[in-house]
Amino acid sequence: MNAMTDLATAPRVNYQTNPEQYQHWSLKVEGNVATLTADFNEDGGLRPGYKLKLNSYDLGVDIELYDAVNRIRFEHPQVQVVVVTSAKDRIFCSGANIFMLGVSSHAWKVNFCKFTNETRNGLEDSSTHDGLKFLAAVNGACAGGGYELALACDEILLIDDRSSAVSLPEVPLLGVLPGTGGLTRVTDKRHVRHDLADIFCTVTEGIRGQKAKDWRLVDDIAKPAQFANAVAEKAAALAAKSTRDAAAKGIRITELKREITENRLVYNTVTVDIDRAKRQATFTVKGPQGALPNTPEAIHAAGENFYPLAMARDLEDAILNMRTNELDIGTWLIKTEGDPKAVLAMDAVLAANKDFWLVRETIGLLRRTFSRLDVSSRSLFALIEKGSCFAGTLLELALTCDRIYHLALPDDADAPRIATGEANHGWYPMATEQSRLQRRFYEEAEP
């Protein structure tokens, strides 16, 4: 059996994990600083056929990274800055594992790159919207996707040891463009001159030391003897810019309760029914029922069971499962069940408590989950039927779709209706920073 056959018959990818199961990352929290240390297990690849040498990564590495960052968001809200570094000698991260890519199908590579992109975008999203800052403490060679991970952080500190360099060697070595935002972030985020960026992307060995700083490829450099102190100083400076409450108390995030069978995924708030003959899946999101906790104390007591948070976690896991494990299901039908008034009441609770850290992080998870639908490479159709609750936050589900079909019952008092609210006007911006209403109607003032 060859590596490609192994990949085709491999078990389902599971996006649920926890720190006790990590093989590649370690998470350490001290006060308002969290440290994520990369020490990728060479023999811990998600699929057979390759070894994760030189801190190169595959999907399993990024699943752990995403889980760790999410735990910092919810279990450690006192953390104001995350330091990303490496435990390997003279190696920070060498990027995506080339042998993994070589034995992977095109669809696998698409899903892999999409998830790694979303994970790095999530770092920037949390920095911009929620005040969680990130420092890349680059203590060794930093190439390809490793540099793209560093680029997603707020600042990059490079060790000046005469050998460690940052590089994007994909073009000269592989004849492909960097796949996780490297080119865009080098020019648009770090404002590297275009001529220097051109040179940088054709230099296999990369750029190190003072030149890397002069070219704006990193923010600062430090000699090995001063590196630890420089990391601490940079972390303290970034923490001072954070809006997160250093006295906040976190909640516990446990494994999702779900049942996965051949043609069905069942969560507490989301159900996915698969019709293989039609190559389509129906996502049904259940709206909130009853009154929600409406004070910071009550919301905190509800924890992971707070409906908007629980729904976001269920929906996100369902999306990731379907994207990765059901490649032949090309059409997703999006439905909702519930009372539109209850959804708008939920949004009122979120609006009234938007300064409370758990509500802010819940809105952030919803924002990132809706963005996953925006780029899921499937045909998405929203079906607005009797009993639907496409209102406010849940209307965003329909607005992420390619098309929206509304059952017309003009003479029926119980005809389905949609409703907009405050949530649809800026809570969940797309990658373009527009609301989905703005994007759908191209910012028209009137219909």
Regions found by a protein language model. Name each.
Residues 2, 107-246, 355, 359-447:
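Conserved catalytic cores of soluble enzyme domains
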Residues 4-12, 20-22, 48-55, 62-64, ...:
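Extended N-terminal export/anchoring regions of large proteins
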Residues 2-16, 53-65, 133, 158-159, ...:
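Charged, low-complexity, helix/coiled-coil-prone segments
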Residues 1-45, 148-152, 191-303, 307, ...:
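Amphipathic alpha-helical segments at domain termini/boundaries
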Residues 31-38, 58-107, 117-137, 159-163, ...:
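A structural preference for short, pocket-lining loop segments at secondary-structure junctions
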Residues 34, 38-48, 57, 61, ...:
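Small-residue-centered hinge/linker elements
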Residues 23, 55-58, 93, 99-102, ...:
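Generic, ordered loop/turn and secondary-structure boundary motif
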Residues 51-52, 97-105, 153-154, 219, ...:
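Short secondary-structure boundary/capping segments
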